[in-house]
A protein has these predicted regions:
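N-terminal helicase ATP-binding lobe
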Residues: 1-190, 194-308, 314-341, 345-566
Length: 566
């Protein structure tokens, strides 16, 4: 093999939280220097076998899907075998189906609408379905022989199992089905964001596969390993700008009318409200927009016509956007997987640069979610303490009566065979993947609220950027000046200026003396801070109409000495 696995690490006696322990003894990591998945793995494929699953971790745009179409599918067809591709969202599935139709000269490509293509799954030796359709696909008796001829099962966007676990209680069951029912096929998992799903994937492949073959058929198992191919990530094309509220980008949108914006809101209501506040230059889509012309344009042509597209997480794993005019992405999430998946929807061309406007969560919202996660974990612990199915069923029924979907998602019912094998029984189970995700998120929020780290520091590490480089506030202040050069500032512009000055003041090493009043600082207070900031040669002056304006100003020598000392 071209990329030899790293040696197993020496065993360290260390207490690791259960939600943070990765089965490193099962994963064999291959550090791949290439930036092309197809070029790097073309000579690896022939070494793969069903006992050893494959995880391809590569940044969006490195050709994971191209590798499937140009390497895996031709190999399967040449051996008269089949390929099953499982994708996350319907939109992603449509894009893949269009590409398959082009490859096979399928006449349906020019006859069907996008809605019609969504309903197509059968492409002969190739089938494309969503994760949500998997159980129905496995129950289809007429497809039994087709499934027996599978050579590859491709689980695209494999972070689905954890990213969707908080609103899809069957993610764990879907993962179990893949590792169990497709144990004789080569299973290829692909994602750009693996950190949350590494542990569940490893445990499912190690446990369920053995259950499927080792105990059921009694076959002798050869040595198994999970091949983990890790490709280099490059985030140099992104400039990070942190904002306190999504409203702050409105002034920048007005200043950059020639640039397109992709805005991810954390709720439908907020998205619709924000889109409406921008007027005719913005459009809004969400999960209910599948029949809209805007959605059809995105799916088929991978671009939008408006200056601003406001959406929810419906796009985070669904649609790719190829449009050089999109130079700004606004993101309202603190979840690492979701954030990077949103960023990845915009595919970059050579020399392209994109500004990421990332909304920092407030302490109030962090505290509220920390309490929610703590309450949910306590419920799961209460469920685990119950010994009988009758007790567990009563416990869950009480939750269902309460009607809180955030709590109901923690449990589900499963039909299994009774021990006497003559009848079935209904089991009440906990959503183990949801428990795992909640525990990880609770730990992350706890670090933010305790002061152990900051949101900016964490996000900067996700993009491999030093914190001081993540947002050059001085450049933003200069941009603000150039846009509003010595002109009266509006009521909307003044809060932006206040924020820039306070951030620069703190970055210069000073402690903000009025942290609870930064949103109401007066002209003199802001000028006092400007006088102490290195290279901040600006001052706020007042016009005859009592309005503020930002002007160039070289502060006196005393201040200059302070600047040189910093």
């Amino acid at each position: 093999m071209l990329y030899q696995p790293k040696e197993k690490p020496q065993v360290r006696i260390e207490r690791i939280p259960w939600w943070n322990a990765i089965p490193d003894d099962f994963y064999f990591k291959h550090e791949v220097p290439s930036r092309s998945v197809k070029d790097a793995l073309a000579n690896e494929v022939d070494y793969w076998r069903a006992e050893c699953p494959v995880l391809i971790e590569a940044q969006t745009g490195l050709g994971k899907t191209t590798f499937v179409y140009e390497e895996l599918i031709p190999r399967a067809l040449s051996r008269h075998k089949n390929v099953l591709i499982i994708s996350n969202r319907i939109a992603l599935s449509v894009q893949q189906k269009i590409r398959i139709m082009k490859m096979t000269d399928d006449p349906r490509r020019d006859l069907l609408t996008d809605l019609g293509i969504q309903k197509c799954e059968d492409f002969g030796a190739i089938r494309i379905i969503t994760y949500h359709r998997l159980h129905e696909f496995l129950r289809a008796e007429n497809l039994k022989k087709w499934r027996e001829q599978l050579l590859y099962v491709v689980a695209d966007e494999a972070h689905f199992f954890t990213s969707d676990a908080l609103f899809n209680r069957y993610c764990g069951s879907i993962l179990q089905s893949i590792t169990t029912y497709f144990s004789r096929a080569i299973r290829v998992y692909m994602t750009a964001t693996s950190w949350d799903v590494l542990k569940p994937l490893g445990e499912a492949e190690r446990g369920n596969y053995l259950n499927a073959l080792g105990t059921v058929t009694g076959e002798v198992m050869r040595d198994r390993r999970f091949h983990h191919y890790i490709f280099p990530f490059d985030y140099s094309a992104y400039c990070l700008c942190f904002i306190k509220s999504i409203e702050e980008v409105k002034i920048h949108i007005k200043q950059k009318r020639q640039e397109k914006w992709l805005v991810f809101c954390n709720s439908r209501d907020k998205g619709k409200e924000f889109s409406e506040s921008l007027g005719d230059v913005a459009s809004y889509i969400d999960a209910d927009s599948k029949k809209d012309t805007i959605w059809a344009e995105l799916v088929r042509h991978e671009r939008f016509d408006e200056q601003i597209l406001v959406t929810t997480a419906v796009l985070d794993c669904g649609v790719n956007i190829h449009d050089e005019a999109v130079k700004n992405i606004v993101i309202c999430t603190d979840d690492r997987t979701s954030l990077l998946q949103m960023v990845g929807r915009k595919r970059l061309g050579p020399q392209e640069k994109v500004t990421l406007w990332i909304v920092e969560p407030s302490k109030k919202s962090l505290s509220a979610r920390l309490m929610q996660y703590s309450r949910q974990l306590e419920m799961i612990q209460s469920f685990d303490s119950l010994k009988t199915q009758k007790e567990r069923s009563s416990f869950v029924n009480r939750l269902l009566e309460n009607g809180d979907p955030k709590e109901n998602i923690l449990f589900y019912t499963s039909v299994t065979q009774h021990p006497d094998k003559r009848r079935e029984r209904l089991l009440v189970c906990k959503n183990q993947l949801a428990e795992y995700v909640i525990a990880r998120r609770k730990a992350f929020l706890g670090k933010l609220l305790s002061g152990e780290t900051t949101f900016q520091e964490e996000v900067s590490t996700w993009f491999d950027k030093p914190t001081e480089e993540s947002a050059d506030t001085l450049e933003l202040l200069e941009e603000f000046y150039q846009t509003n050069a010595e002109k009266p500032l509006s009521k909307e512009q003044i809060p932006i200026l206040r924020k820039l000055i306070v951030e620069l003041y703190c970055k210069a090493g000073y402690t903000e003396p009025q942290p609870t009043r930064t949103e109401s600082l007066k002209q003199n207070a802001l000028n006092n801070r400007l006088s102490k900031i290195p290279n901040a040669d600006y001052r706020i002056e007042e016009t005859s109409e009592k309005m503020w304006k930002l002007v160039r100003y070289e502060w006196p020598q005393a201040s200059g000495e302070i600047k040189r000392q910093l």
